[in-house]
């Protein structure tokens, strides 16, 4: 039986799936995506939505990257656990990520159910504990637990194969990051056989790697578990009064202490169409500055992350019914990405990412900015070094991103100087 993923035009989706060999069976694996995070460091972009629902790259949302990786690899039983302000995320999953074909294959948004009492999730491990009915229903041999808010390409099947070969209870995906940034991650120390000997969750003084003290081997927040071992660990963690019920802080160290944790080096992962330049690209866009810089990479002449690799496509149907972008009355865009449905009329866009359904009116200038869907930039307005959230209106003649002192009175400014205008704001 053939499976078709509806992503805009069904025929195109079917063509891609056929090319990727989607007749492969993955019946023994269940994927759980943790998508309940608040994303406080991305405020105000997360003021009205969960972090995985934040728009990215003109036509995507952050969750589209992990879902694309799982679907491209043929893992078609996916549960997305949501909690914090999840309405837009739930709606996106229901509209953009629906299968036509066997009902045994699905991407399901699963809000917090309070199955174990009148309490919300107390941590990432507690989220899975409270959702074990999903595991019991499917009875998989392996459970993938992936984060929902990173920008990257990965073939999870290669990690699963590595996990099976290791014979361990859990495999953690690891990547090298600068030691100066590693305090934001779980940090891994492993022996020559990839056995994790120590796992430190967000340490103040991260350890360097043996061959390069300036780098740290960090957890990507992606795990493969043998199912029985995961269930046992969650049950024991539930009854541990000292636990914070966190995957990285409690569950992974539990397996490390038992000698049952394996590390998978993300640098070994190869996806179709990748190059040496973009291989092992992974970005945590959890701060405004990181989010902004990831967008600036996209519009560079030779971006490190190539959105245009159709051998491993990043999928989304964010307003797929919109017409192409239009440039009229001498409107131009230079070194920019302009998404469908947008109109640049007698205005100039430079070094920017302009999302769907944006209007830039006569005489306006947009430079070095990220403009999210539905924004309106009025006549003669100037928007520079900014992030404008959805449906922001910049009135005629308004200037943002030029006078920092004035901007500080109205908007949030990141440590890197990026001005952020929140959703639905009228300037």
Swiss-Prot record:
A GO MF label: ATP binding
Keywords assigned: ATP-binding, Carbohydrate metabolism, Glycogen biosynthesis, Glycogen metabolism, Nucleotide-binding, Nucleotidyltransferase, Transferase
Pfam families per the UniProt record, alphabetical: Hexapep_GlmU, NTP_transferase
GO biological process, alphabetically ordered: glycogen biosynthetic process
Catalytic activity line of the entry: alpha-D-glucose 1-phosphate + ATP + H(+) = ADP-alpha-D-glucose + diphosphate
InterPro entries: ADP-Glc_PPase (IPR011831), ADP_Glu_pyroP_CS (IPR005836), GlgC_bac (IPR023049), GlmU/GlgC-like_hexapep (IPR056818), NTP_transferase_dom (IPR005835), Nucleotide-diphossugar_trans (IPR029044), Trimer_LpxA-like_sf (IPR011004)
EC identifiers of the protein: 2.7.7.27
Cysteine-cysteine disulfides: none
UniProt keyword annotation of ATP-binding present: yes
Pathway(s) it belongs to: Glycan biosynthesis; glycogen biosynthesis
Domain of life: Bacteria
Record-listed alpha-D-glucose 1-phosphate binding positions: 121, 186, 201-202, 219
NCBIfam families: glgC, PRK00725.1, PRK00844.1
Job of this protein: Involved in the biosynthesis of ADP-glucose, a building block required for the elongation reactions to produce glycogen. Catalyzes the reaction between ATP and alpha-D-glucose 1-phosphate (G1P) to produce pyrophosphate and ADP-Glc.
Subunit structure: Homotetramer.
Protein family according to the UniProt entry: Belongs to the bacterial/plant glucose-1-phosphate adenylyltransferase family.
PANTHER family according to UniProt: GLUCOSE-1-PHOSPHATE ADENYLYLTRANSFERASE (PTHR43523:SF2), GLUCOSE-1-PHOSPHATE ADENYLYLTRANSFERASE-RELATED (PTHR43523)
Name this polypeptide is given: Glucose-1-phosphate adenylyltransferase
Organism encoding this protein: Corynebacterium diphtheriae (strain ATCC 700971 / NCTC 13129 / Biotype gravis)
């Amino acid at each position: 039986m053939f499976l078709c993923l509806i992503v805009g035009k069904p025929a195109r989706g079917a063509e891609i799936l056929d090319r990727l060999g989607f007749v492969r069976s993955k019946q023994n694996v269940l994927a759980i995506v943790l998508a309940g995070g608040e994303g406080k460091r991305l405020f105000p972009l997360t003021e009205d939505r969960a972090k995985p629902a934040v728009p990215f790259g003109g036509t995507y949302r952050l969750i589209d990257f992990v879902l694309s990786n799982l679907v491209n690899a043929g893992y078609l039983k996916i549960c997305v656990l949501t909690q914090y302000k999840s309405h837009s995320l739930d709606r996106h999953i229901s509209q953009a990520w629906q299968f036509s074909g066997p009902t045994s294959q699905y991407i399901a948004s699963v809000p917090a159910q309070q199955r174990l009492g009148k309490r919300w999730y107390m941590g990432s491990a507690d989220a899975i504990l409270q959702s074990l009915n999903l595991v019991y229903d499917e009875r998989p041999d392996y459970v993938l637990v992936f984060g929902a808010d990173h920008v990257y390409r990965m073939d999870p099947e290669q990690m699963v194969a590595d996990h099976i070969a290791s014979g361990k209870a859990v495999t953690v995906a690891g990547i090298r990051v600068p030691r100066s940034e590693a305090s934001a991650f779980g940090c891994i120390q492993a022996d020559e056989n990839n056995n994790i000997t120590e796992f430190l969750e967000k340490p103040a003084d991260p350890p360097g790697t043996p061959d390069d003290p300036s780098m740290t081997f960090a957890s990507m927040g992606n795990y493969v578990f043998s199912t029985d071992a995961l269930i046992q660990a969650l049950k024991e963690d539930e009854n541990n009064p000292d636990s914070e019920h966190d995957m990285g802080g409690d569950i992974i160290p539990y397996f490390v202490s038992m000698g049952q944790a394996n590390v998978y080096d993300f640098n070994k992962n190869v996806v179709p169409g990748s190059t040496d330049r973009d291989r092992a690209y992974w970005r945590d866009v959890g701060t405004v500055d990181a989010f902004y810089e990831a967008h600036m990479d996209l519009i560079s002449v030779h971006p490190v992350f190539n959105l245009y690799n159709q051998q491993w496509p990043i999928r989304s149907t964010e307003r797929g019914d919109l017409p192409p972008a239009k440039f009229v009355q001498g409107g131009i865009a230079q070194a920019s990405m302009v998404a469908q449905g947008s109109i640049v009329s007698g205005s100039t866009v430079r070094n920017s990412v302009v999302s769907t359904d944006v209007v830039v009116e006569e005489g306006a200038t947009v430079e070095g900015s990220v403009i999210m869907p539905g924004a309106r930039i009025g006549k003669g307005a100037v928007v520079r070094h900014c992030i404008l959230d959805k449906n922001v209106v910049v009135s005629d003649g308004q200037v943002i991103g030029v006078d920092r002192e004035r901007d500080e009175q109205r908007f949030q400014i990141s440590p890197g100087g990026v001005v952020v205008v929140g959703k639905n704001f009228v300037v």
